């Protein structure tokens, strides 16, 4: 049996998730830059099942758009089945089966939308194990030191599975069992359909439990097998924010380790957070306190951090980014950024450029080799190559109603405290004096100076601040001790 021709996957995402205590649907809470449901759908899409169904119920009007987005992103159809009333997992699976063609006769894989670390290898192993035998159902199990909240696996003395008992219905003796149901199964569809029609809700939660299918199949003298997963994190579900945080740490450690094995030096894995879609080139060094988020792309031989957060930022080979907060920006090869630099969306720094201490940029293009060393705001601007912007300069882009653009050419040198009142253009090779307020265009090669001649008013301190410390110091410097 092959997964691509014989399997359908049903993902259960209909529950209310009340223990999350959140306005956000549980399956949309994120780990490593992806929602839990996105993690699961990414995984199940990789096994190339013939049909993929998401069962939605509570908050489906908010979850359905995410399913549609993922369907487009993954390039495959994801059917949506609706569970209008939350009557239990058995009822949810029955709703999911209604989305399959009536003549589908293959294997049905069932998983939950809140098992974010489930991987392709584990699912493939389940499908292979189930397809190679005569079992009507195969259950993924794992062993937990604290199984509280999970259904327990009931076995005979010969270790055959005879049932699954939910926590609420378990006896004290059964609650000591540490082998648990993960909520991931493979079924033959005919046996599954038959068993679902016989589910009863006479249990502690008055629901139709999918787990009761195991006992029904055993009563039908059908074989039920278990496939044990040693790495319990792969099949651990999330019910509250503590579990979300715990699994997030596990996933982050695995992401960090994968980058390390691929040739990235990460000084302190415990303080470094890297989202699942981030790419990092070989021989890059990541220092403590760094977060690389979203679709960030970092080249080879870079230095990132410490204390740096980059979200959807592309960093070229050999760049250095220190104590910087950046989003939706591009940093060119060999460029230097930081410390204490703020890159807002739309920043594009060219190769070998520099953005130094306490520089903020937004919606700007800064050319190759251009330097903005310190204490400057650059917004809505285009700067050419190999220019230098003096300290404490401001690109004055907003008049209270409209934002305008500033254009600065190549090989320009601007003095400290230059104000660029947009819209304004500074031509190639031009200079500005310190303290200049530019309201008019500057021709190529010109020097722009807006400040008037300096006036020194002799004796002003003696007249206006007589007897002050300044007056005494001035008199002493002038040799007037009177």
Swiss-Prot record:
<keyword id="KW-0808">Transferase</keyword>
<feature type="active site" description="Proton acceptor">
    <location>
        <position position="374"/>
    </location>
</feature>
<comment type="similarity">
    <text>In the N-terminal section; belongs to the N-acetylglucosamine-1-phosphate uridyltransferase family.</text>
</comment>
<dbReference type="GO" id="GO:0003977">
    <property type="term" value="F:UDP-N-acetylglucosamine diphosphorylase activity"/>
</dbReference>
<feature type="binding site">
    <location>
        <begin position="12"/>
        <end position="15"/>
    </location>
    <ligand>
        <name>UDP-N-acetyl-alpha-D-glucosamine</name>
    </ligand>
</feature>
<keyword id="KW-0479">Metal-binding</keyword>
<dbReference type="GO" id="GO:0000902">
    <property type="term" value="P:cell morphogenesis"/>
</dbReference>
<dbReference type="GO" id="GO:0000287">
    <property type="term" value="F:magnesium ion binding"/>
</dbReference>
<feature type="binding site">
    <location>
        <position position="166"/>
    </location>
    <ligand>
        <name>UDP-N-acetyl-alpha-D-glucosamine</name>
    </ligand>
</feature>
<feature type="binding site">
    <location>
        <position position="239"/>
    </location>
    <ligand>
        <name>Mg(2+)</name>
    </ligand>
</feature>
<keyword id="KW-0573">Peptidoglycan synthesis</keyword>
<feature type="binding site">
    <location>
        <position position="388"/>
    </location>
    <ligand>
        <name>UDP-N-acetyl-alpha-D-glucosamine</name>
    </ligand>
</feature>
<dbReference type="InterPro" id="IPR005882">
    <property type="entry name" value="Bifunctional_GlmU"/>
</dbReference>
<feature type="binding site">
    <location>
        <begin position="112"/>
        <end position="114"/>
    </location>
    <ligand>
        <name>UDP-N-acetyl-alpha-D-glucosamine</name>
    </ligand>
</feature>
<dbReference type="InterPro" id="IPR011004">
    <property type="entry name" value="Trimer_LpxA-like_sf"/>
</dbReference>
<comment type="function">
    <text>Catalyzes the last two sequential reactions in the de novo biosynthetic pathway for UDP-N-acetylglucosamine (UDP-GlcNAc). The C-terminal domain catalyzes the transfer of acetyl group from acetyl coenzyme A to glucosamine-1-phosphate (GlcN-1-P) to produce N-acetylglucosamine-1-phosphate (GlcNAc-1-P), which is converted into UDP-GlcNAc by the transfer of uridine 5-monophosphate (from uridine 5-triphosphate), a reaction catalyzed by the N-terminal domain.</text>
</comment>
<comment type="similarity">
    <text>In the C-terminal section; belongs to the transferase hexapeptide repeat family.</text>
</comment>
<keyword id="KW-0511">Multifunctional enzyme</keyword>
<dbReference type="Pfam" id="PF00132">
    <property type="entry name" value="Hexapep"/>
</dbReference>
<dbReference type="GO" id="GO:0006048">
    <property type="term" value="P:UDP-N-acetylglucosamine biosynthetic process"/>
</dbReference>
<feature type="binding site">
    <location>
        <position position="391"/>
    </location>
    <ligand>
        <name>acetyl-CoA</name>
    </ligand>
</feature>
<dbReference type="InterPro" id="IPR025877">
    <property type="entry name" value="MobA-like_NTP_Trfase"/>
</dbReference>
<feature type="binding site">
    <location>
        <position position="239"/>
    </location>
    <ligand>
        <name>UDP-N-acetyl-alpha-D-glucosamine</name>
    </ligand>
</feature>
<keyword id="KW-0963">Cytoplasm</keyword>
<keyword id="KW-0460">Magnesium</keyword>
<feature type="region of interest" description="Pyrophosphorylase">
    <location>
        <begin position="1"/>
        <end position="241"/>
    </location>
</feature>
<feature type="binding site">
    <location>
        <position position="434"/>
    </location>
    <ligand>
        <name>acetyl-CoA</name>
    </ligand>
</feature>
<feature type="binding site">
    <location>
        <position position="416"/>
    </location>
    <ligand>
        <name>acetyl-CoA</name>
    </ligand>
</feature>
<feature type="binding site">
    <location>
        <position position="83"/>
    </location>
    <ligand>
        <name>UDP-N-acetyl-alpha-D-glucosamine</name>
    </ligand>
</feature>
<dbReference type="InterPro" id="IPR038009">
    <property type="entry name" value="GlmU_C_LbH"/>
</dbReference>
<feature type="binding site">
    <location>
        <position position="26"/>
    </location>
    <ligand>
        <name>UDP-N-acetyl-alpha-D-glucosamine</name>
    </ligand>
</feature>
<feature type="binding site">
    <location>
        <position position="377"/>
    </location>
    <ligand>
        <name>UDP-N-acetyl-alpha-D-glucosamine</name>
    </ligand>
</feature>
<feature type="region of interest" description="N-acetyltransferase">
    <location>
        <begin position="263"/>
        <end position="482"/>
    </location>
</feature>
<feature type="binding site">
    <location>
        <position position="362"/>
    </location>
    <ligand>
        <name>UDP-N-acetyl-alpha-D-glucosamine</name>
    </ligand>
</feature>
<feature type="binding site">
    <location>
        <position position="114"/>
    </location>
    <ligand>
        <name>Mg(2+)</name>
    </ligand>
</feature>
<feature type="binding site">
    <location>
        <position position="181"/>
    </location>
    <ligand>
        <name>UDP-N-acetyl-alpha-D-glucosamine</name>
    </ligand>
</feature>
<dbReference type="GO" id="GO:0008360">
    <property type="term" value="P:regulation of cell shape"/>
</dbReference>
<dbReference type="GO" id="GO:0016020">
    <property type="term" value="C:membrane"/>
</dbReference>
<feature type="binding site">
    <location>
        <begin position="397"/>
        <end position="398"/>
    </location>
    <ligand>
        <name>acetyl-CoA</name>
    </ligand>
</feature>
<dbReference type="GO" id="GO:0009252">
    <property type="term" value="P:peptidoglycan biosynthetic process"/>
</dbReference>
<feature type="compositionally biased region" description="Basic and acidic residues">
    <location>
        <begin position="472"/>
        <end position="482"/>
    </location>
</feature>
<keyword id="KW-0133">Cell shape</keyword>
